[in-house]
Design a protein with these regions (language model features):
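N-terminal loops that bind phosphate or other acidic moieties
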Residues: 1-46, 56-57, 61-173
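Glycine- and acidic-rich phosphate- and metal-coordinating loops
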Residues: 53
Length: 173
């Protein structure tokens, strides 16, 4: 009924280090977020937890389901748009747009005092697009992190997800 998914090894490492969850029992989906959702629905899963780096999953917040850079790379533009929504001053938004990586942009947003609100909004948007893709057939939760900053935000039900897994699998997570 439940499946844990991460685009790559960093997500697996983050989950093990932060939550003690061994994602060897999970699925690595690479850049194919949309296809992974389609397969999970087809296989009859009811819940999915997607854990990923801000640099990968920010694209999903823009509705992009194949996150490979050759398909789309609007990471800074999306980060800037969510920053505008949360009222970040224009000079900091310009600085974000000049960044090469999302990790580089995070201290700028942290300095604005709006980082938690921005990340929460991004996770909400990621979940919106994930569930839109699933067409109501799969509840999807999300945990967003950065290598240097750890967990940035998670969907409201993400923590409950671990309890469900523990009950179903009868083991400590």
């Amino acid at each position: 009924d439940y499946v844990a998914v991460s685009p790559g090894n960093y997500g697996l490492d983050f989950m093990k280090k932060t939550y003690g969850y061994d994602l060897d029992r999970s699925v690595k989906c690479s850049n194919f977020i949309g296809d992974t959702i389609d397969m999970a629905v087809e296989l009859g899963f009811k819940k999915m937890l997607l854990t990923g780096h801000i640099g990968k999953l920010i694209k999903v917040a823009g509705g992009i389901m194949n996150t490979h850079s050759k398909e789309a790379d609007c990471r800074m533009e999306l980060l800037a748009a969510f920053s505008v929504k949360e009222g970040v001053e224009i000079e900091k938004i310009r600085q974000v747009l000049d960044c090469v990586t999302t990790e580089e942009a995070i201290p700028i947003l942290e300095d604005s005092g709006k980082l938690p609100a921005i990340m929460e909004t991004i996770v909400e948007r990621i979940c919106f697009y994930l569930e839109k893709r699933a067409k109501g057939k799969l509840q999807i939760d999300c945990i967003l992190y950065a290598n240097e900053f750890g967990e940035l935000a998670k969907s409201k039900e993400a923590v409950k997800w671990f309890t469900l897994l523990e009950q179903e699998q009868g083991q400590s997570i």
